[in-house]
């Protein structure tokens, strides 16, 4: 009978696998890539919200043109020459100017209002982001949308 060889510690621990440092490097790389991805995604979201608000402003402008052809004056939320966008003014635009056709729903990130523009007897549409200081302004005299405090 052959004698049993004793297994030494160095022979027993020769298991193959990834060292801890390699696993930590992989986890760090995945963390960095996900942080960059989340930052880029939030930029895409805010950009798409702004574009959606610009399209809504253009729809309101077209409704204003139709309202003017029927009434010989522009519809507005207030008799003042400026307004403060809110959920109330947005709802009034939908119910009175748009005839109940909801272009401003709960998913819209901006609140809107319409005021008269005394400079050219036209109108101004303002849109303010609900959770940031971004404000979009449309003037009927220039038909341009200007942005302030928007990233």
Locations of the language-model features?
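Membrane-proximal amphipathic alpha-helices
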Residues: 42-57
């Amino acid at each position: 009978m052959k004698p049993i060889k004793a297994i030494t510690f160095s022979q027993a621990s020769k298991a193959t696998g990834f060292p801890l440092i390699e696993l930590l490097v992989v986890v760090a790389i995945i963390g960095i890539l996900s942080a960059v991805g989340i930052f880029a995604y939030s930029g895409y979201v805010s950009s798409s919200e702004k574009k959606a608000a610009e399209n809504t402003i253009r729809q309101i402008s077209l409704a204003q043109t139709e309202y003017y052809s029927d009434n010989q004056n522009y519809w507005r939320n207030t008799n003042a020459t400026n307004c403060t966008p809110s959920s109330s003014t947005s709802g009034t635009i939908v119910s009175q100017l748009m005839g109940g056709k909801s272009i401003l729903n709960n998913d819209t990130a901006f609140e809107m209002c319409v005021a008269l523009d005394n400079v050219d007897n036209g109108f101004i549409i303002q849109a303010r982001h609900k959770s940031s200081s971004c404000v979009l302004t449309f003037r009927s005299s220039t038909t341009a949308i200007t942005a302030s405090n928007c990233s």
